[in-house]
A protein has these predicted regions:
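Active-site-proximal cap/lid insertion segments
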Residues: 1-167
Length: 167
């Protein structure tokens, strides 16, 4: 991106999908796939972070998730993408992870609402769902959410209280 005319924060950000997004810590590629590939080799901090992420996931989910992300490591080893080709993969994987997260939230909010309906609790229960500000989804080539620009200053809000608020 051309940084002329932008403030310091814009110029010094470390949110570039191509240059700053880490394969292991941000995209969950097992470091074992990358250790002998100099162009992708993760540093110790990235390896530690990856292990911390995986250790928080209980079995058998951890094995299932690692299998899903194994495809990424295999692709990197086989194709060794660089430049725009690597950017394309990173962005696709980032969006797949983001959309999987959104789908999971949708599914589980639905489970809560279904439970309330099935137990006749809907009319007297307010359900309020919100979250923090949104992520950059490739705008300006960025990911994450470190700066307060308009694109990321949106928060989800869902309220359901049929006994009090009309839909």
């Amino acid at each position: 991106n051309d940084t002329a005319g932008h403030g310091t924060a814009w110029r010094v950000q470390t949110m570039s999908i191509l240059h700053d997004m880490k394969l292991s810590s941000d995209l969950k590629v097992d470091p074992a796939f990358l250790m002998d590939l100099p162009e992708y080799k993760p540093d110790e901090k990235e390896i530690t972070y990856y292990k911390a992420i995986m250790n928080r996931i209980p079995e058998p989910d951890r094995s299932r998730i690692k299998k899903i992300y194994e495809e990424r490591g295999l692709l990197l080893r086989e194709k060794r993408p660089a430049g725009k080709e690597l950017l394309k993969y990173k962005y696709q994987w980032y969006m797949q992870d983001y959309l999987a997260c959104v789908a999971s939230v949708d599914e589980n909010v639905g489970r809560v609402l279904d439970y309330l309906d099935q137990h006749q609790l809907t009319q007297n229960t307010m359900v309020l769902y919100t979250g923090d500000q949104g992520m950059y989804l490739g705008e300006n080539g960025w990911f994450d959410k470190r700066w307060m620009y308009e694109v990321s200053m949106q928060a989800p809000l869902l309220i359901r209280w049929p006994g009090k608020i009309r839909a």
